A protein has these predicted regions:
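Walker B catalytic acidic pair
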Residues: 54-58
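Non-catalytic, compositionally simple segments
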Residues: 62-69, 74-182
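Glycine-rich nucleotide phosphate-binding loop and flanking beta-alpha elements
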Residues: 41, 59, 89
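Structural motif
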Residues: 50-52, 81
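Inter-Walker segment of RecA-like/P-loop motor cores
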Residues: 2-49
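Extended hydrophobic-aromatic, low-complexity segments
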Residues: 45-46, 61-63
Length: 182
């Protein structure tokens, strides 16, 4: 909704979309996009055509995922997307998705429509060479502001690694205690 309220885009986008804080609707095809909170209660019965899970590293279990995905199939051609950085919650859904992705990519397991796109350094030592950062952040060459932010975070991490552990986890895709990724 924020992009629809941005003065830079508001006029152009309002011709194509109607929006409130809860819903965005296409004016031409009447397609509706709704956001939901992280509360699984009362969500049974949804008829979702597309479900996007953001920041999957925060999910401790499958409660929310099950509620939103069991409604799929009631609508033709259902789709799911899982988008996240790495995180510190072990043995949660993210670990399962990463393991499945590695089996698909490296062991030949059938994908069944699951497209893993995993971006991370191969080992911790690579972090000291900025040319490797693109492995964990493919958009760095196109976003100079992001590159500058990652450089700042890297310097802070070098000075105080114990206080800035999120740098390795979220920016470089390597959890604390992890030795190698691939």
């Amino acid at each position: 909704v924020d992009v629809l309220e941005n003065p830079k885009w508001e006029k152009k986008l309002s011709r194509h979309y109607y929006h409130t804080k809860e819903v965005i609707q296409g004016r031409k095809n009447k397609g509706v996009m709704k956001g939901h909170t992280n509360n699984p209660k009362g969500r049974d019965g949804l008829r979702s055509g597309k479900v996007i899970f953001n920041e999957v590293h925060q999910y401790e279990n499958y409660d929310n995922i099950k509620v939103f995905t069991t409604g799929q199939g009631k609508v033709a051609q259902p789709r799911r997307g899982y988008f996240t950085s790495n995180g510190d919650i072990s043995d949660g859904p993210l670990d399962d998705y990463l393991a499945r992705g590695r089996r698909i990519l490296f062991e030949g397991e059938a994908d069944n429509g699951f497209l893993p796109f995993i971006c991370c350094l191969n080992d911790k030592a690579q972090v000291h060479h900025p040319e490797n950062w693109q492995m964990a952040n493919p958009s760095l060459p196109y976003l100079p502001e992001l590159y500058a932010e990652v450089e700042d975070e890297y310097r802070e991490w070098l000075e105080h690694p114990e206080q800035n552990g999120d740098f390795m986890t979220k920016r470089m895709g390597i959890r604390s205690g992890a030795k190698e990724i691939a």
